């Protein structure tokens, strides 16, 4: 995944020092794009170990429309703990917007169900979009959506996905986001009878926190290894029917984990 290493090098070489909401400080660049061909291997970073369990369970949690961390905690995933209230609630974050966007007329819009149906019915549509950025509810969210809009595209029997991420924690968050949306693209492709195409990751404010700079430099000393292969249970034909057991990652041989603190 040289695309990711190129981004690290760009930020370390060109990044502007900026203040941020957390008070940590960042090096930041604005506007960056990475492309991953999903038939070339599953884009799971190999220059440090990533937690597949957390990536898959978070995605399944989003698709459930859930916004309470109980499901995650029950499966040993703690990545949202810092933002939850005393009841485990996060407000109307990703899952709520994906599955039950509140319309002005009182309806609840299931964007995921709608986009899957539209891909099947009208694959050439330029409206194959899901957004989590709901200005009317931002203030109610524990954390406004960082990966805020994605669009599908069908050509030559393949499904591609482009994600726009307004705010990108490049050391901790971005590797996670790449794997998550690559997997989502594969899942949607399967249930719509298509093959996976590309995952395209477009970043707005792409930043390294000041307490992640040494870790990023360490990671750049490591040589990327061959990408693993993700297989999905072919019997699942409903986007909401996937379980953790339906995913198997083969030949994942990463370098060791690199510890870094989350900026809250």
Curated annotation (Swiss-Prot):
Pfam assignment, any one: Thymidylat_synt
Annotated binding of (6R)-5,10-methylene-5,6,7,8-tetrahydrofolate, by residue: 169, 263
UniProt pathway: Pyrimidine metabolism; dTTP biosynthesis
A single cellular component GO annotation: cytosol
E.C. numbers: 2.1.1.45
Functional description taken from the UniProt entry: Catalyzes the reductive methylation of 2'-deoxyuridine-5'-monophosphate (dUMP) to 2'-deoxythymidine-5'-monophosphate (dTMP) while utilizing 5,10-methylenetetrahydrofolate (mTHF) as the methyl donor and reductant in the reaction, yielding dihydrofolate (DHF) as a by-product. This enzymatic reaction provides an intracellular de novo source of dTMP, an essential precursor for DNA biosynthesis.
Descriptive protein name: Thymidylate synthase
Source species of the chain: Rhodopseudomonas palustris (strain BisB18)
